[in-house]
């Protein structure tokens, strides 16, 4: 089966209510794929982190207290939580732009998912309220190819029997999985 077929099969499984995908991909999985593939593997294999840590609580607080009156939250297919602005754009809120590509890819995945699975075309806004920064995000031919490459990558990583090779990254020291990697 070619890699294109993997994405097509994923889309078919998602669109057909009588089928479900082998791997129900979430936005967080897409983000982890672009941050650290080991982190993705751990999370996808049931090795989850403590959601009460300071960094996660800070992110939750920024998300919950920003743009409150101009957006509504929706849960799509019991796994993808979207915020829709009054303008109709999909919004993703992050504390910092330090990991901009993973955040952007997460939002692009949401836009791709809406278009491919639900035939809904939307544009996006990536917001960093603590930095007073916003970026428009559009799903086009190039970004669609990036998302589909990411979907292939996520399916590959999650399907492995063991985590990907250890790779030292600048943010390993603040990663909640660091004890699993560096003990």
From Swiss-Prot:
Keyword 4Fe-4S: yes
Keyword Metal-binding appears in the UniProt entry: yes
Binding site for Mn(2+): 83, 92
Cofactor: Mg(2+); Mn(2+); Cu(2+); [4Fe-4S] cluster
Keywords, alphabetical: 4Fe-4S, Antiviral defense, Exonuclease, Hydrolase, Iron, Iron-sulfur, Manganese, Metal-binding, Nuclease, Plasmid
One Pfam family cited in the UniProt record for this chain: Cas_Cas4
Binding-site list for [4Fe-4S] cluster: 36, 172, 175, 181
EC number(s) stated in the UniProt entry for this protein: 3.1.12.1
Any one of the GO BP annotations: defense response to virus
Catalyzed reaction equations: exonucleolytic cleavage in the 5'- to 3'-direction to yield nucleoside 3'-phosphates
InterPro entries to which the protein is assigned, alphabetical: CRISPR-assoc_prot_Cas4, Dna2/Cas4_DUF83, PDDEXK-like_dom_sf
Consequences of knocking out this gene: Loss of the 8 Cas genes in this locus (cas1, cas2, cas3, cas4, cas5, cas6, cas7 and cas8b) leads to loss of CRISPR interference against plasmid targeted by this CRISPR locus, i.e. plasmid is not destroyed by CRISPR.
GO MF annotations, alphabetized: 4 iron, 4 sulfur cluster binding; exonuclease activity; metal ion binding
Comment on bound cofactor: Mg(2+) or Mn(2+) required for ssDNA cleavage activity. Can also utilise Cu(2+). Binds 1 [4Fe-4S] cluster per subunit.
Record function comment: CRISPR (clustered regularly interspaced short palindromic repeat) is an adaptive immune system that provides protection against mobile genetic elements (viruses, transposable elements and conjugative plasmids). CRISPR clusters contain sequences complementary to antecedent mobile elements and target invading nucleic acids. CRISPR clusters are transcribed and processed into CRISPR RNA (crRNA). This protein may be a 5' to 3' ssDNA exonuclease. Plasmid targeted by CRISPR locus P1 transform wild-type cells very poorly.
UniProt record similarity statement: Belongs to the CRISPR-associated exonuclease Cas4 family.
Note: There are 3 CRISPR RNA loci in this organism and a single cas gene locus. A CRISPR-Cas type I-B system.
Protein name: CRISPR-associated exonuclease Cas4
Biological source species: Haloferax volcanii (strain ATCC 29605 / DSM 3757 / JCM 8879 / NBRC 14742 / NCIMB 2012 / VKM B-1768 / DS2) (Halobacterium volcanii)
Annotated gene: cas4
């Amino acid at each position: 089966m070619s890699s294109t077929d993997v994405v097509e099969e994923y889309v078919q499984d998602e669109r057909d209510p009588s089928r479900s995908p082998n791997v129900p991909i979430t936005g967080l999985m897409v983000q982890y794929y672009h941050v650290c593939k080991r982190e993705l593997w751990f999370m996808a294999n049931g090795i989850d982190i403590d959601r009460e840590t300071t960094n996660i609580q800070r992110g939750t607080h920024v998300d919950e207290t920003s743009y409150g009156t101009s957006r509504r939250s929706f849960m799509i297919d019991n796994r993808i939580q979207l915020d829709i602005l009054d303008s109709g754009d999909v919004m993703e809120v992050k504390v910092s732009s330090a990991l901009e590509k993973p955040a952007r890819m997460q939002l692009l995945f949401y836009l791709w998912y809406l278009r491919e699975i639900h035939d809904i075309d939307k544009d996006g806004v990536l917001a960093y309220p603590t930095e007073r920064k916003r970026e428009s995000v559009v799903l086009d031919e190039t970004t669609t190819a990036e998302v589909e490459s990411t979907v292939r990558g996520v399916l590959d990583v999650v399907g492995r029997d063991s985590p990907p090779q250890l790779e030292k990254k600048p943010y390993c020291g603040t990663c909640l999985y660091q004890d699993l990697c560096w003990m």
